[in-house]
Amino acid sequence: MLIGESAIEPVRVSEKLHQTTFWQGRGGAVTHFISGIDIALWDIFGKVTKQPISRLLGGRYRDRIKPYGSLIMQEPEIFPPRLEAAVERGFKAIKMGWGPFGRFGDKMDEAIIRTARETVGADVELMVDAGGSDRYWPHGYKWALETAKMLKQYDVVWFEEALRPDDLQGYIKLTENAPLPIASCEVLTRRQAFMPWIEQRAVDYIQPDVTKVGGLSEEYRIAMHAYDHSILFVPHGWNTAVGLAADLQLVAAVPTARWVEYITPAPYVEDIVAEPFTLDEDGLLSISEAPGLGIEWNSDGVKAHSGMELTRSDL
């Protein structure tokens, strides 16, 4: 399906792959695989034309974006050092996810959030990811609504993955009634799966993952469909430097984007590229104008984490 194809027509080639893998099932691992191919084709397209992907998508609305440091929650008595390390790195926004939250009772949940707010202070944005896509997630709408009310008291920016990832009707009710923005959809694949969530306003913030949905070709279409329905695009990015570089190009090309996810600490983000991503004094990330994704490999870092020796063709 790929041999002999053009390497500078990512949208058409990716759509061909979606169409011709129909019998293997649309979505899931097949779409994850296509995502990697699509991102690579966009990088090639950018390098051939000597343009950043964001410009090839239609233009750049910004040159910097606020990253939120994304980290796993811990019990309140041991959590502060992890939060302090993120603040020390320069993050002005932090998302806390999974860990014990939602798994050991409401008192534990509030103690974690109270500790986090007291640790980072009033000027750092806090986001909460309950991890409702975790296996056997036990909670439904009533828990999510009451938890959202608690989070509002601590000035949490958004509440993510409060319900199981396929609970469309629950999310519609929660988004309508919660006192703070609701975010979800990181596990969905292909733009067709996102349409009911956007068109029925099931979330305030939509979170496609470029390494899962079909790559840049699909995610840009999802982001602009959300924009047309006044839903904020916040890309999910719990992956590698390639995912972050792709997300940065996307948020540059979407009019209302405000944040990008940045795992912290993140050896698979920081160690495998020649020029690591760095936050400026305002806590923002610059969005590269170099061709393609705007990154080059650090072959030593790739070898250290994967055992692979990069050849010239890999670079």
Regions found by a protein language model. Give the residues of each.
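Predominant activation on well-ordered alpha-helical scaffold segments within soluble catalytic domains
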Residues: 14, 34, 38, 42-43, ...
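Proline-centered loop/turn at the N-terminus of a beta-strand
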Residues: 52, 66, 125, 181, ...
